[in-house]
């Protein structure tokens, strides 16, 4: 009986437990399948909203804006909640299988109860987070720097005293407006640049220094625009405001600031009140400007003026001979002749620089005697003196390239590659795989002769305004009235219409860059016109007649006209070799384009509205094709047409189509001419295998909005796929790769293959939620030995490093790196990155700027005290 009684109690308990379980949890168990499905759906919605937000963030950050803290907080919560949700969902199949009794109960009642509860709670969390993820704004502008450093290329000789006296004059209590005047090329801009930079090194109580280049033909609105951008006032509605409205905005901003306004290269009086500049004396603010004319100083009503004069003889001789030591010692009579030539420069720094550099290469006394005869006397015109350096250029092609470079506006920096492509289009140099070598050789010749000046990044060049005047003077026949219409250069002249030309039949080159021209309707009757530059205007309409009578036009640049949607027939342009339609709003290519049998260069980059191009193979002589960031669907058919182009030597391309990408990666012939490759919205691969040969010539590589867990690099001489790591051979090297950008890519854990990009200058890694290391920690020890064998120094030429929104990133590289050219590090929202690969020897002699959140910088670990003092002094 006892045994039966015991069993009865046990059964009762089991029944009671089952009844209790069913009564308490039947709805929870019965609805588990629905709750799991709802959680999956809501997580997908949250991930989609996150991805859309990341795209908006990318656009804003590309504009220099900083991510809002509330948006960053939301993204961090999303990453956390999504990971937690996926962990819960990974158990869903097992838990659903455990349901029994018509899904009213579970084989593991207590555990399933807890699981069902966690699903419901997480669903509520995700729904709540989804509702919070609606943001009108995602980013805002950061603090305005007090001063922006100015770089100057001219050798500083003999200006020490005038810099000090100018600074002291500006600091005088009674001086609010200072005028600096002197002839062209005397060093006024260099002087003003040094004054600007003193605000970085000398203690002062100014709130902001503002630099504006005025130049010829200034407009109030253009000056207002530059000031507005510096004050962070410029926005999308700026163009619709009147000058008076903008002036009021600028005035309100400056009234409560102690400002320093530096206006360079003023040719006429500028009404400061119309611009919105408050009276400087009221709160100790200062305004200084440079001009070639003392008359401008008088018209401006300056409180004090300073004349910048030519150098005294000792300083002039020092500047002239600074690179001549070996030359002066090569013959005993050369110093005497050199002094004769130096004196003819009249102490003008620009002439001394230009002529001195030219003469430094002449080693024989005969060459020096010949140079003396070029100058007619001490009173020779400065353009004639400067022309000597032009005449000394041995190659006629180099001379032609130099003269072409004057078609751009004053102070206009143009990319070296862009300039070379113009030269090819004009037929000055031939296009080929070696184009850059020849073009860069010519640029090197011109920069060494001080006829072109390199930008800070070395990627762009510009002309000194006096040198540009000389080039335009030469192109127009050195003052010969009969040739004055050969060249029409009205760049940055505030034109609203195509200018009237007195003798159209004489015109060979026309540059109307950077104006406000909206329509080009009247026919150009220019039978000799070879070059027409209309880039960076406001073009909306080009009539059929406009281009009907320019039979030998070779270069046509319509780029940077975003409102230009339709184009007339290009059938009359049968001589055209160069066509740039980048950054326009065109929706289709013009009629007659495919009949242009002489076309060598076609640029369709950033034509977002252009969706298709047809029969590209009908352009048999095309050598350069640029399709980066266009809206064109690069289908497998189009890729095969590009494959068949026999003369192509430069290609940029954005691939969104998986079939097109497979054909592209499968043909190593693309390697010889693909300069830039962008993979966009690629989510078809668990492992993307990229043949080394396909990207060995690429200068930039971008991967964005993609899910690719692994990037593998296939070797160039075997069928084995080699992940760039310890087994990489010496021949695996991305020798040409200069820029890498990865944006919103999931799955990638590291970027170890970047070690073998020895010339990488820019690395931009943003929104990679899974990346843990830039260079894999597990491979570093073996990589180090491989690098030594291959002669590779990781990141030795890296200049700019940007890492943002990398929640799992723990390290860049295990050991400190030399970073021989590093200029800037930008870190944001990388909470697990606690140390940079720097020591006290890193970036030696470089002034590295580290931009990061203050809290993150304070918590950063440093190699030692010396390293911290070097990069983050207290």
Swiss-Prot record:
One of its GO terms (biological process) is defense response. InterPro entries: Apaf_helical (IPR042197), Leu-rich_rpt (IPR001611), Leu-rich_rpt_typical-subtyp (IPR003591), LRR_dom_sf (IPR032675), NB-ARC (IPR002182), P-loop_NTPase (IPR027417), Plant_NBS-LRR (IPR050905), WH-like_DNA-bd_sf (IPR036388). Residues 22-74 form a coiled coil. Residues 139-434 form the NB-ARC domain. Pfam families: LRR_8, NB-ARC, WH_DRP. Transmembrane segments: none annotated. GO terms for molecular function: ADP binding; ATP binding. Keywords: ATP-binding, Coiled coil, Leucine-rich repeat, Nucleotide-binding, Plant defense, Repeat. ATP binds at residues 182-189. LRR repeats lie at residues 483-505, 506-527, 528-548, 552-574, 575-597, 598-620, 621-642. Belongs to the disease resistance NB-LRR family. The LRR repeats probably act as specificity determinant of pathogen recognition. Potential disease resistance protein. This is Putative disease resistance protein At5g05400. The lineage of its organism: Eukaryota, Viridiplantae, Streptophyta, Embryophyta, Tracheophyta.
């Amino acid at each position: 009986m006892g045994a039966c009684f015991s069993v009865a109690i046990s059964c009762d308990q089991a029944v009671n437990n089952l009844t209790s379980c069913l009564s308490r949890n039947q709805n929870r168990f019965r609805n588990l399948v629905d709750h799991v499905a709802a959680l999956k759906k809501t997580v997908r919605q949250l991930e989609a909203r996150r991805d859309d937000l990341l795209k908006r963030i990318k656009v804003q950050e590309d504009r220099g804006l900083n991510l809002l803290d509330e948006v960053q907080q939301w993204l961090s919560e999303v990453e956390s909640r999504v990971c937690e949700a996926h962990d819960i969902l990974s158990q869903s199949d097992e838990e659903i299988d455990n349901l029994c009794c018509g899904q009213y109960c579970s084989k593991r009642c207590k555990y399933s109860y807890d699981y069902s509860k966690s699903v419901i709670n997480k669903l509520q969390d995700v729904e709540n987070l989804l509702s919070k993820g609606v943001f009108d704004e995602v980013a805002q502008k950061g603090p305005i720097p007090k001063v922006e450093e100015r770089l100057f290329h001219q050798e500083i000789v003999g200006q020490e005293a005038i810099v000090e006296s100018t600074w002291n004059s500006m600091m005088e209590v009674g001086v609010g407006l200072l005028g600096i005047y002197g002839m062209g090329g005397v060093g006024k801009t260099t002087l003003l640049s040094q004054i600007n930079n003193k605000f970085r090194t000398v203690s002062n109580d100014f709130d902001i220094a503002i630099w504006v280049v005025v130049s010829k033909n200034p407009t109030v609105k253009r000056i207002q625009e530059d000031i507005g951008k510096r004050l962070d006032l410029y926005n999308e509605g700026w163009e619709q405001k009147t000058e008076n409205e903008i002036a009021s905005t600028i005035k309100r901003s400056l009234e409560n600031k102690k400002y320093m306004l530096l206006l360079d290269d003023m040719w006429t009086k500028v009404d400061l009140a119309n611009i919105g500049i408050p009276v400087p004396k009221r709160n100790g603010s200062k305004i200084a400007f440079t001009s070639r004319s003392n008359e401008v100083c008088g018209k401006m009503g300056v409180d004090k003026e300073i004349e910048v004069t030519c150098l005294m003889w000792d300083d002039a001789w020092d500047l002239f001979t600074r690179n001549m030591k070996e030359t002066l010692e090569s013959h005993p009579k050369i110093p005497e002749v050199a002094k004769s030539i130096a004196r003819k420069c009249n102490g003008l720094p620009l002439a001394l620089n230009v002529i001195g550099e030219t003469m430094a290469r002449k080693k024989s006394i005969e060459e020096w005697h010949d140079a003396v005869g070029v100058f007619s006397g001490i009173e020779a015109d400065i353009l004639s003196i400067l022309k000597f350096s032009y005449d000394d250029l041995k190659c006629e092609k180099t001379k032609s390239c130099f003269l072409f470079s004057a078609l751009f506006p004053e102070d206009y920096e143009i990319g070296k590659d862009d300039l070379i492509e113009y030269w090819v289009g004009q037929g000055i140099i031939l296009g080929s795989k070696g184009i850059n070598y020849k073009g860069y050789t010519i640029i090197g010749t011109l920069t060494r002769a001080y006829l072109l000046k390199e930008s800070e990044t070395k990627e762009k060049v510009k002309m000194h305004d006096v040198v540009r005047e000389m080039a335009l003077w030469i192109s127009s026949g050195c003052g010969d009235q009969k040739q004055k219409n050969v060249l029409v250069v009205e760049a940055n002249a505030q034109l609203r219409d195509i200018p009237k030309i007195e003798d159209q039949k004489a015109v060979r080159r026309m540059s109307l860059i950077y104006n406000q021209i909206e329509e080009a309707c009247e026919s150009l009757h220019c039978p000799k016109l070879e070059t027409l530059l209309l880039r960076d205007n406001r073009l909306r309409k080009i009539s059929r007649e406009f281009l009907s009578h320019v039979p030998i036009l070779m270069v046509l640049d319509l780029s940077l006209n975003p409102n230009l949607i339709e184009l007339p027939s290009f059938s009359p342009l049968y001589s055209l070799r160069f066509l740039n339609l980048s950054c326009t709003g065109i929706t289709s290519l013009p009629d007659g384009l495919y009949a242009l049998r002489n076309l060598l260069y076609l640029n369709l980059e950033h034509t977002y509205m252009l969706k298709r191009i047809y029969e590209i193979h009908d352009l048999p002589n095309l050598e350069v094709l640029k399709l980066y960031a266009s809206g064109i669907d690069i289908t497998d058919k189009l890729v095969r047409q590009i494959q068949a182009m026999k003369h192509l030597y430069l290609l940029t391309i954005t691939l969104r189509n998986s079939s097109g990408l497979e054909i592209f990666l499968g043909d190593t012939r693309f390697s010889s001419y693909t300069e830039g490759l962008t993979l966009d919205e690629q989510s078809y691969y668990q492992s993307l295998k990229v043949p080394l040969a396909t990207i060995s010539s690429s200068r930039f590589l971008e991967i964005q909005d993609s899910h690719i867990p692994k990037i593998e690099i296939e070797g160039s001489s075997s069928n084995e796929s080699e992940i760039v790591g310890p087994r990489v051979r010496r021949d695996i090297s991305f020798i040409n790769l200069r820029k890498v950008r990865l944006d919103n890519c999931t799955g990638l854990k590291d970027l170890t293959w970047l070690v073998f990009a020895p010339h990488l200058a820019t690395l931009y890694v943003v929104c990679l939620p899974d990346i843990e290391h830039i260079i894999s920690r597990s491979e570093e020890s073996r990589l180090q030995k491989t690098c030594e064998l291959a002669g590779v120094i990781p990141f030795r030429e890296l200049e700019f490093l940007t890492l943002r929104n990398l929640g799992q990133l723990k390290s860049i590289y295990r050991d400190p790196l030399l970073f021989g050219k590093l200029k800037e590090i930008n870190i944001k929202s990388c909470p697990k990155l606690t140390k940079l690969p720097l020591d006290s020897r890193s970036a030696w002699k470089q002034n590295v700027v580290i931009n990061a959140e203050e809290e993150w910088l304070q918590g950063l670990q440093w190699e030692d005290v010396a390293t911290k003092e070097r990069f983050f002094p207290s």
